[in-house]
Amino acid sequence: MYIKDNTLVDDDNVTHRIGDCCIFIMDDNYKSNIAGCIADIGFCNNCISVEEVNSSGQLTLLFTEHIKVIGRLED
């Protein structure tokens, strides 16, 4: 699963369009930078929080439907 060009592609290679979302992570610089990148591409219309951002740039997101999505922010 990965995130690219304002879409999320899941493990079955299904593409999901991503809408607007504000994500704020008041933590270390790395997480803040990742959050800024997510905000810049308008990531995820119904995401309510980022559960984790690890050193490899992998994101765990919690959606309003209580589904956790793990993806990677790619260029």
Can you say where each PLM-predicted feature lies in the sequence?
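Basic/aromatic-rich interaction segments and small domains that mediate binding to polyanionic partners
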Residues: 21-64
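Intrinsically disordered, low-complexity, charged/polar segments
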Residues: 2-6, 53-75
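Mixed-charge, Lys/Arg-rich low-complexity intrinsically disordered regions
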Residues: 1-18
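Surface-exposed charge patches in extracellular/virion surface proteins
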Residues: 17, 30-31, 68, 72
